[in-house]
Amino acid sequence: LMAIRVLVTFVVFALWAVSATADPYAALSRLEGAELKSAVSAIAARGHRPLSYRELWEVLKDADQDPSRSGHVVGIYSRTAIPAHCTEGKAPASCDQKWNREHVWPKSKAFPRRDQWAHTDAHHVAAELVRCNSLRGNLDLAVGGEHIPECASRRGKGASATWEPSDAAKGQVARMLMYVAVRYEGDPIGDRTPNLELVQRSTRDGEPNLGNLCVLLRWGQAFPVTQQERDRHAAVARHQGNRNPFVDRPDLAQRIWGKECRVP
């Protein structure tokens, strides 16, 4: 009897070990649309350790470091190399430029509190020049607007203003936002964040939505994952514990949202 118990214990442990190391995406091959989105959400949440807002400074100094200039971070939109010590609020007088923590999915839509996990999620919070962060504000993503050279982006005017990052940033920004849209499905694991959705319209401050889904889907398809994006992803995963499935498997985006946008 003891031998049988030992054998059963060994088999259970072996199966657990295999499942723990298996490709988490292998079981998704037959899923599409909403079912696939739900399954990808579970993968995106796996291992997530919420960061403090203070921790984000050091995480971004690592994740957004400039590989060609030691001691600098690279802005998510501007692609400007900024001295890492020139942080907003603590930068010495010698700093000509300052950077802060840009929420690519604006925190005013809809996770303004620091105890909400999306507020400190480094998979979509990135280094950026203070001015470019301010100019982006809470704008939806779309094509068009006045070119802002220092931010390498375009910004519209008026109530329906939008933000268009440069081609160098479009794919990465799209995959960051897709991650947020699947990761946060209405607090299933106590992350204190509402269900966040990408939509095909302009959005208002305070609502848990961001536009424009179909523009982002096109950007994600047109601008593939770069080595810089892979390196950033790996750094965030080391600190935070979870992964962005759209960096690992960019094809998932079309399988989740392609029919909504008629993108092949």
Locate each region found by the language model:
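Mature, extracytoplasmic segments of signal peptide-bearing proteins
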Residues: I4, V18-A20
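Domain-level detector of nuclease and nuclease-like folds
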Residues: K90-P264
